């Protein structure tokens, strides 16, 4: 069954690419068609889907880090980091308040308290690295004013911020409130440990690749893959942000001389696509489309708000200090807030944690991701 799903996904993806349909979105649709409301393939374990998503996102972020050239991102390092941190926070705040206001309306069929509304917004607050890397490079866009590296830096580094917001809000809800000091401390520890571990382990990976004399050169990419998983795991064990660590480690490896670079890049590129397909398929299988119809209108309104108000407002506020960035560039960055599977992956965390209203969060995230990906790609 798995081989059939992979084959169908590749064929459908190739067909969709010709007509300008988002390839990654089609993988999600294939999973839904084969799922419980389609051909009847049963997959209901959110914890397994979360684990698959975690592995896939680690590989995607590391590969994205390898493709991020420091010379390209250096001129836009300031705005890129602000967008990936403050931008995510503002997007979550604005959208969370809108969801809270919307859920209190008599004509909506949901009611979410302010904390759950902010949690829903946090899961959707980051742009998707897989979608950004895939679309900007496959379409070969000739963007000026360093827009491509800015968007890639933002998308590669803002997932950790959205992840931290999601985890902190889940802890806040389950503990009936956390102190401001505990929240700030959690953010600082995750950032510091994640960044430090990514830098140190990235350096160690470079040294191992260049110093270890392995007779079979095909094992070098596998060695690096093992290092990706080790980096994520040890950082998570140290209470740091594993996603930030693997992204920084990827930047370190990609911007230094390493043995068998071509073989490693080819291996990682193929592996990234494989796990993107698997990730979207699993998330599609996990979904029950009939349940999404109940929140379709609300999800659509949230999507419209984020695309037309939430994202642009956050971008313009974040880029205010950077006067050299033109108005056209600000508008483009505001519009290209590409979404993919990351919000759905993060939406599995409330489900696994048993947060009240988690099924609503998951279904809205899926519908929003589908709408946003389709509108932004067009």
Identify the meaning behind each predicted range.
Residues 1-371, 378:
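Transmembrane helical cores of multi-pass secondary ion antiporters/exchangers
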